[in-house]
Each structure stands twice: as C-alpha cells, then as structure tokens.
Amino acid sequence: MESQKVRNRQGLKVYGEGEWKVKKHGTDGKRRVWRKLHIAVDTSTYEIIAAELSLSTVTGGEVFPNLLKQTRRSIFEVSGDGAYDTGACHAAIQIKGATALVPPREGAAFWERAHPRNLTVGCQKLYGSNKYWKERYGYHRRSLSETAMYRVKQLLGGRLSLRNYNAQVGETYAMIKALDKLTGLGMPETCRIDWRC
C-alpha cells in the first residue's frame, strides 16, 4: 500500500524536579526541560507511522533520515516544512523512492542539474512565492501532522513524567501506540458549515 507521509515536530514538557521548583519558587528559565517529538503521519489512515523523541537542541533535519528509515511501507510523497529543505533530507527521500513536497526557503538557489527540488525553486522564482506550488501539489495535507500532534497533546497530556531519557522514549512510544489504537477505532467526520442565512 502506498501512502503519503507528512512530518512534524513539537516540544513536550518534561514534568520533573525543575518544573516543581518553578511552580513552588517562581519562574526560572534555566530549570525547564523540553524534548522534541518528531512524528510521521500516513495521510490516508491518520496513523502515526514513525516517531522519535530527541533533545530540544536537535533539529528536525537531523532526525529526519532516521525517521524515514523507520517506515516499512511504500511511500509516494513526503511533506514537511522548510526546515527539511536540506541535502540530507532530500537524499533520504530519494532513497525511499518518494517525491519531496518540501518548500524551499526564501531566495533558494537551484541545486545540481535535474534535481527534483529545482521544480519547486523554479515555481518560487517564477511566481514570487511558494503559494502556487503549494496549491498545485497539495501541500496543505501537511496540516494532518499538526492535527496528530494536537491529538497527542490533548488526549495524552503533552508532557512526560519520567526523568530518565530512555524511559521517556518508552513513555512516548506508549503514548503513540495508544493514540494509534484510538485512531483505529475511528476518526470524527468533519464537514464545512455555511453560516449564511
């Protein structure tokens, strides 16, 4: 089964001694600890098909190739924001045999001849922005990863309670597994409501 994969990353608060001290004694920015949760979502099933927890200093582009290796299914498109517009990310997508739907950064230059990214850069230079390219190639589906991250935070609390990093990784995978079970039971159906009378 081929699927489209969308990527996102967002912070999870680690609730431990540092948070308790902030609550008890007032704000002190040094004590707060965050972890970044990087996820990949299948746009047809809304299932989180890959996840990785990293330190707050790690960028999404550094984690992306490992996250892509976790997926065992055939993928035809990979969407992500401009942070994934790196050579390593595009190389990982090409190895997987997928098309990259990653907007180039503003003022991006062309890469080597016949690179798939050059089409996107050409659209940006021709139209002055990425708007036309985003509409043409369905970049809006990337919002499904934002929705999945929202579900993680709303349904499962969006914070980690364990202090050990390895235990936090296990806690995160348990959260993702639970969320995928809930998603498998069914997603709410949404429809647009016209408020005009």
Q: Can you name each region flagged by the protein language model?
A:
Residues 130-197:
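Basic, amphipathic alpha-helical segments enriched in Lys/Arg and hydrophobic/aromatic residues
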Residues 10, 15, 20, 29, ...:
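Alpha-helical structural elements
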Residues 25, 61, 122-124, 185:
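Intrinsically disordered and other compositionally biased segments
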Residues 1-99, 104-106, 110-112, 173-176, ...:
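Polybasic low-complexity intrinsically disordered regions
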Residues 8, 66, 118, 130, ...:
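Detector for Asparagine
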Residues 44, 87, 117-120, 168, ...:
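Intrinsic disorder/low-complexity detector
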Residues 82, 87-154, 162:
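Helix-centered, glycine/charged polyanion-binding patches within enzymatic domains
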